[in-house]
Amino acid sequence: MSHFHRTAAFHTLGCKLNFAETSTIARQLTDAGYDKVSFDDRADIYVINTCSVTENADRECKLHVKRAMKANPEGLVVIVGCYAQLKPEEISQIAGVDLVLGAKEKFNILSYLDDLEKSESEGVVHSCEIEETDFFIGSYSIGDRTRAFLKVQDGCDYKCTYCTIPLARGISRSDTIENVLKNAREIAERDIKEIVLTGVNIGDYGKGEFGNKRHEHTFLDLISELNQVEGIERIRISSIEPNLLKDESIELVSKSKSFVPHFHIPLQSGSDELLKKMKRRYLTKLYNDRVHKIRDVMPDAAIGVDVIVGFPGETEELFMETYNFLNELPISYLHVFTYSERENTEAVGMQGVVPIPERKKRNKMLRILSEKKKMAFYQTQLGKTLPVLWEHENKDGKMYGFTENYVRVQKDFEQASVNQIEFLNLEKILSDGTVSVQSSYESFLAKA
């Protein structure tokens, strides 16, 4: 096969960690002589990296298999990722799927390609028990974005009652600080301006760094070392558990030239009763304390929140506890997830199932609240001159970028601005929810 199959296409579903891992798999194939092409182009190999968090994992997987088959009916389709680990046999039955690789095998894709042929029936499965996945494979994305996702940690030892991620990714384990720094320097040398630190539970960094369960280092050790790396304009922390976000880490970010003032902190519920049912490792008092600590030392920081609606036992009263808690918190935006039942999780057997229409109603209420929070936060940034990193896409003659504190801005497309950081004055909020900008010099003249 190696003489005939020379093009490969990739599609990623889900989180930033998946993007980092897809990029690593893509580099393995390109290093072996494959040319990378668009997913809608005719390719010899299609790799789909799946997610298990969204309730539509099965439908999305089938949709992208069909896309691949439409582009090239003779192309080989390989499925990897969290959904592939959880449901390998089901995926192998999808028409068009030729190979399913579990968590342990996804980075060994090349070893399977030479003998792989287009399946007339079901795909070949190479999976494993998740307990066998106890090693760390470093990954980072590069080449297709103005920012790189750098994987520093994988797996999770928490037992949240709604979550399948430990079943899909295994125990908590970390890259070594030396390797993280090496990867960060490689990214910086490629003129990528922003690195996003990713993992399943990055606040748990250091566990399993050298193949054991002890913490050799901490998350604070990691970010302290990264803070010294030359050539990285921005480092963003993707998401960190509130109980693992320590004062020292917040203080370091507040004084750093590289780490940006942006935190994404999962909450999941503003009800202590539900947090206990979810087996989260904090209550609302600690969460409230973390948010206000950030605000005290970084008044302009963006603070994002994950929240789940419709968890079993979430009465109207308990939902309103969440709503009111979030409404009072000085946060910047929400990511709202509607609870969906997952096999092999504790929550599946819980009493107090919330009807689907009620889940959707609560989701809508929190999405409206999120928009209000975001607009209020953006309003506080108008009139300020902030650094903007411009992205590469040209959307109807416009280009978009983000400030350090995650305000999304736009201007007329200029090729020279792509992947550049420009200091610009934030003018006004536009109808699409982005912010218009003008150069700080133009702003100075307008006020003169």
Language model: regions and residue ranges:
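A structural micro-motif
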Residues: 34, 75, 98, 232-233, ...
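Terminal RNA-binding accessory module
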Residues: 349-448
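Glycine-centered loop/turn positions within well-structured domains
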Residues: 107, 158, 203, 243, ...
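Contiguous mid-protein beta-loop-alpha structural module that forms a pocket-lining wall or clamp
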Residues: 314, 330-331
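Short, solvent-exposed loop/turn segments at secondary-structure boundaries
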Residues: 57-59, 171-178, 206-213, 277-280, ...
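Conserved SAM/AdoMet-binding glycine-rich loop
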Residues: 77-78, 86-87, 91, 189-316
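Residue-level signal for inorganic ion chemistry
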Residues: 47, 82, 109, 197, ...
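Proteins enriched for Cys/Gly/acidic motifs involved in redox and nucleic-acid/cofactor modification
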Residues: 1-205, 218, 248, 263, ...
